[in-house]
């Protein structure tokens, strides 16, 4: 491939987004105009299915193009074994630099690398630990348990934009406005340890749920 013809590709992967909760798929109340615009200008797949209800294995299927029972990463933090080719590995020989930004819930196959004599801190070892992608800005959002840098570069970027704090991601980017108009960070939001644990008084309502395009604090994007 001629490197001059290589184009940038931005692949956005949403976590826990149901297709039938998009107005372009016919939801009667929820309005998703920005996603609708993308669907209208592009290709809308009406019969596309994730390969696992668990997010990590499903991501590995996106990366490898294979079923969960084939790539073997059957749960969050189950390593994708050494030698498993991903889209990052396939694109690199074509002159494309591929990187992951955000979370992926994948851990390196340390035992596999040890068996093959690969240094986890080497260039190839770090790529294996990032699903075949180049290390960039990894943040699985579960500090300090993820084993990754608890002070990602994005936090310093937010401070440089004037969003001060010990953890600007939590205090500013991951913030919302409550019913009284007060700004609440993710630390104070309701924690539900099971999906859709909605209080009875809020379980049925005629008021459509808001789906903001960006943070109420007008977070800068990078």
What are these regions (language model features)?
Residues 1-222:
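Formylglycine-dependent sulfatase
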